[in-house]
Amino acid sequence: SKNINAKVAGLESMNVFNMKFDIVSMINVLEHLPDPEFVIKEIQSHVLRKNGLLIIDVPNEFNDFQVAGKEVHNLNEWWIAPPGHLSYFSSTSLRNLLEKNGFEIFKMEASFPLEMFLLFGEKYVGDPILGKSCHKKRINFELNLKKQAKEDKLYAFYEALAELGLGRQLRCYARKI
């Protein structure tokens, strides 16, 4: 009803439509690529229009809370997951990748830092029951803030986490320049 022209394409055929787009969204994609920089360059050069919007969501790996939780509980680096995950990102590395390749980041936010539960003493890694319990607590945290009309604080919190390099996921909003 909004007259939106949207296409879904695999990375191997990004420009199959031989057209440019205003928005490209890559949610949990970049970490699966062997050469994420090549894909970002292709999007910048051939897929997005000038001033087009690129939205990327990736796991925030090797963050300080994750590493501290690993050390506290003497865990392996559970987030290293080949062959599925081939590339790993932090807020700094994601920012550098995009800025180096012709994008200006105008917003970055993180998601709830689940690794805090490890630091609280709840060893959820490898424990699906406890993992589900921790996930429910995160959901309740967000729902309760929203019910109290504190969404602005929640979003500011997630932006601050991204600035600190913390949070489970990173979502980046960048404009092609």
What are these regions (language model features)?
Residues S1-H73, P83-K100, C172-I177:
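Conserved SAM-binding loop
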Residues N15-F17, A81-L86, M116, S133-R138:
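Short, surface-exposed, polar/charged, turn-prone segments marking secondary-structure boundaries
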Residues F17-M19, I23, E42-S45, G84, ...:
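A broadly tuned preference for mixed-charge, low-complexity surface segments
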Residues I27, V58-N60, W78, E142-Q148:
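N-terminal start-of-chain detector that recognizes signal peptides
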Residues F65, E71-V72, E77, Q148, ...:
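Short leucine-rich amphipathic alpha-helices used at interfaces
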Residues K70-I80, K123-P128:
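Short glycine/proline- and charge-enriched loop/turn segments
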Residues S91-S111, N144-K150:
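A SAM-dependent methyltransferase catalytic signature shared across enzymes that methylate proteins
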Residues A110-I177:
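A C-terminal cap/extension of S-adenosyl-L-methionine-dependent methyltransferases
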